[in-house]
Amino acid sequence: MNTPSRIQRSRAKGWKAPDGAVYVGRPTRWGNPFPRDNEGVAIECIPMGLDGEDPHDRAAAAADLYRRWLTGGKVNEMIAAFLPVIKGKPQTLRQIQRDLGGKNLMCWCPLDQPCHADVLLELANSPADRE
């Protein structure tokens, strides 16, 4: 079996999503509620030692916030004040593993940038707590 990977979606003529790949972008239940253009994400770069003006660093901070949201990690209160109001609860590790385990995940993020799909791939295919 091949290792699941992240696939960048494309609007290029003739591009077709691979069979069985799951789209995990923002409008889906798997989407990252922390957009990289949000001021709170830029502020989150500071304690991480990243540059809040750099798109790559902002992508890393957004993915880190997503990981903490999914795994119950803490978000600094000052940063939380700048983040979008999130409705609903994150998917559980069990749901992530059940629905995404072993599957390729698609998002619009460039493959050379950090992405929440990388977080989902790691959690979905982690042996910990697997049923």
What are these regions (language model features)?
Residues 1-131:
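Catalytic phosphate/metal-binding cores of nucleic-acid and nucleotide-processing enzymes, i.e., regions
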